[in-house]
């Protein structure tokens, strides 16, 4: 797992541990994640953020984007208003 997702994952785990789903109803984290209706809005937002983070880690087009090559023919032409000596 990438380091950038680790913090979000820890925050999500902490949120789940302190939610009524796990703390009061004594359900497992897996059960709470399946029934998102029982979770507070903060946990739901962290679930979405964690999923987005994982998707970005796998999306190679966003990880290594190379700038398009410039057309060198246009760059080497002399401007028409320059006098040749």
From Swiss-Prot:
A motif (Cx9C motif) lies at residues 43-53. One of its GO terms (biological process) is mitochondrial cytochrome c oxidase assembly. Residues 18-61 form the CHCH domain. Its main location: mitochondrion. It is found in: Mitochondrion. Residues 65-85 are annotated as: Disordered. The keyword Nucleotide-binding does not apply. GO terms for cellular component: mitochondrial intermembrane space; mitochondrion. Keywords: Disulfide bond, Mitochondrion. Disulfide bonds join 21-53, 32-43. The keyword Disulfide bond applies. A motif (Cx10C motif) lies at residues 21-32. Belongs to the PET191 family. This is Mitochondrial protein pet191 homolog.
